[in-house]
């Protein structure tokens, strides 16, 4: 049994290789780089335009040498990280609080936003589902929900050709 300590508030882990993984955090403006074989932190990736108090990175998916990360709480961006340099090389603005991230079999990224909440200092809007081209890192389509809807837990099926999410019921697209 091994353990990696001194992380702020770890959320998700993505394995780049057997000896390198990224660990996202909430309430930290860094993504930690760890060596899972040696149980140690080897570095971190600074997330632009975030403070430690407003930092929030969540789920990760990989396309070629790039890892995409959704920035959730009080954020509205998807980050693109070059795994060879461990640096953020792109940012894409989406709606308030992208809560889930997935990549389908056609190399399209999908993210669903929760829209924040009424009275939030960051804002409150209708949530949206976004389809993003991983190659060009641009939004191809936005599907808007109603204000007050709460889409979450977006997932793809096993063949990665059908999208599911929860919003009071289980939805399929």
List where the protein language model places each region.
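Predominantly soluble domains enriched in secretory-pathway, periplasmic, or organellar proteins
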Residues: 1-173
């Amino acid at each position: 049994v091994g353990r990696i300590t001194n992380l702020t508030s770890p959320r998700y882990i993505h394995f780049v290789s057997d000896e390198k993984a990224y660990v996202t955090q909430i309430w930290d403006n860094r993504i930690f780089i760890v060596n899972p074989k040696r149980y140690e932190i080897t570095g971190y990736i600074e997330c632009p335009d975030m403070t430690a108090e407003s930092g929030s990175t969540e789920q990760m998916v990989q396309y070629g040498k790039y890892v995409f990360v959704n920035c959730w709480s009080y954020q509205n961006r998807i980050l693109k990280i070059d795994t060879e340099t461990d640096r953020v090389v792109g940012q894409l603005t989406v709606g308030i609080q992208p809560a889930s991230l997935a990549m389908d079999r056609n190399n399209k990224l999908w993210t669903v936003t929760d829209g924040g909440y009424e009275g939030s200092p960051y804002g409150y809007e209708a949530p949206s589902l976004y389809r993003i081209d991983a190659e060009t890192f641009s939004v191809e389509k936005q599907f808007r929900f109603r204000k007050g809807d709460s889409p979450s837990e977006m997932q793809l099926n096993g063949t990665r050709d059908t999208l599911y999410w929860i919003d009071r019921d289980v939805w399929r697209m």
